[in-house]
Amino acid sequence: MSIGTDAETKKKIIAEYAKTEGDTGSPEVQIALLSHRISHLTEHLKQHKHDHHSRRGLLLLVGQRRRLLNYLQKTEIERYRSIVERLGLRR
């Protein structure tokens, strides 16, 4: 099992959360991609409890997602609520 996100999965996530064709930079897409990587890393760390290097990477990803969510919450609250509900994030 690889820790990264393969191209096929990435394309599916982008297609599902993109606002328009070719939209890879919107906060929704970025948050969805980060959430996928976070869930993968979380599963990895359940098996490998002493992998501190990956744990640090996980914390950085969570922080990045948190900043994107904060930005979306401040600028467009409806889009924020939508993405939190779609991804099932607790906040």
UniProtKB/Swiss-Prot annotation:
MF GO annotations: rRNA binding; structural constituent of ribosome
UniProtKB keywords: Ribonucleoprotein, Ribosomal protein, RNA-binding, rRNA-binding
Presence of keyword rRNA-binding: yes
GO CC annotation terms, alphabetical: cytosolic small ribosomal subunit
PROSITE patterns on file: RIBOSOMAL_S15
Transmembrane segments: none
Biological process annotations from GO: translation
Pfam families membership: Ribosomal_S15 (PF00312)
Organism domain of life: Bacteria
Keyword Flavoprotein (UniProt): no
Annotated coiled-coil segments of the chain: none
InterPro entries: Ribosomal_uS15, Ribosomal_uS15_bac-type, uS15_NS1_RNA-bd_sf
Family from the record: Belongs to the universal ribosomal protein uS15 family.
Role: One of the primary rRNA binding proteins, it binds directly to 16S rRNA where it helps nucleate assembly of the platform of the 30S subunit by binding and bridging several RNA helices of the 16S rRNA. Forms an intersubunit bridge (bridge B4) with the 23S rRNA of the 50S subunit in the ribosome.
Record note on quaternary structure: Part of the 30S ribosomal subunit. Forms a bridge to the 50S subunit in the 70S ribosome, contacting the 23S rRNA.
PANTHER family: RIBOSOMAL PROTEIN S15, BACTERIAL AND ORGANELLAR, SMALL RIBOSOMAL SUBUNIT PROTEIN US15M
HAMAP family to which the protein is assigned, alphabetical: Ribosomal_uS15_B
NCBIfam families in the record: S15_bact
Protein name listed in UniProt: Small ribosomal subunit protein uS15
Organism of this sequence: Nocardioides sp. (strain ATCC BAA-499 / JS614)
Gene transcribed to yield this protein: rpsO
